[in-house]
Curated annotation (Swiss-Prot):
GO biological process, one term: adaptive immune response
Disulfide bonding pattern of the chain: none
Protein name, per record: Fibrinogen alpha chain
GO CC terms: extracellular region
Recorded name of the encoding gene: FGA
Length: 15
């Protein structure tokens, strides 16, 4: 998934 600003916040990215 695309992170909301974090990198490993939701296991997503920093997009």
């Amino acid at each position: 998934e695309d992170g909301s600003g974090e990198f490993l916040a939701e296991g997503g990215g920093v997009r």
